[in-house]
Amino acid sequence: MPELPEVEVVRRGLQDHVVGKTMTAVRVHHPRAVRRHEAGPADLTARLLGARISGTDRRGKYLWLTLDAGAPTTGRDDPDTALVVHLGMSGQMLLGGVPRAEHVRISAVLDDGTVLSFADQRTFGGWQLADLVSVDGSVVPAPVAHLARDPLDPLFDVDSVIKVLRGKHSEIKRQLLDQQVVSGIGNIYADEALWRAKVHGARVAATLTRRQLGAVLDAAADVMREALAKGGTSFDSLYVNVNGQSGYFDRSLDAYGREGEHCRRCGAVMRREKFMNRSSFYCPRCQPRPRR
């Protein structure tokens, strides 16, 4: 599943290419792609027709396009709304041609002739329209309001998150994956952050010191910034930017996917274990398991 860096790469591409443009035609090719929009496909297409894209934003793994209220071509007087995009496991926001047309679930034609397509092979992602609401000093779509801030958010408060983690009596990795504690971190970057901080993912969050928790959160922010600079992590053709190009941070991973390889820090053989129906990768020497 795309995590924060991959979603931010897509957002930046959309910011550069679609802001200021108006949707002149919209077609839903697969109803599952708009299942989160409770009013249905016809309502979504009608409300998007003539809508002007005024900006882009993101929180965690969700991104959205801000739409001008009451687009002049429609005469509507809607409240400020956003087109919320969740990429799911394999969603892509593509401009221009698409390599596999059969995977296109939604398409929108912009006023300059550009086609914006939502392709999704596994159909876990989708689009929905939502009102923008004010939450904790930020304006976000209502379906995103429950998410915590992510480590790259300018208003992310490390001390406040540490305080929350100090009260959690479950594994630190479980907490990193909880989007209501800190958003944007998935399995890949959780393993990378824990490796950098020399903390085993099975350690109970409440037993870690403030310094250790701070190190984990700082490492998460650092590794995601580095991944963002390299276009994100792409293990296959499913994770691409708006131009269909893959990222290459997978070549720089220190923990994830490196079972049986030597730790780049101490030389021990990296291990893999099951955790929450996922795989966790760690160094047994740098990140010793907690005692039972």
Swiss-Prot record:
DNA binds at H103, R122, K168. Coiled coil: none annotated. One of its GO terms (molecular function) is class I DNA-(apurinic or apyrimidinic site) endonuclease activity. Keywords: DNA damage, DNA repair, DNA-binding, Glycosidase, Hydrolase, Lyase, Metal-binding, Multifunctional enzyme, Zinc, Zinc-finger. Its cofactor is Zn(2+). HAMAP family: Fapy_DNA_glycosyl. This is Formamidopyrimidine-DNA glycosylase. The gene is mutM.
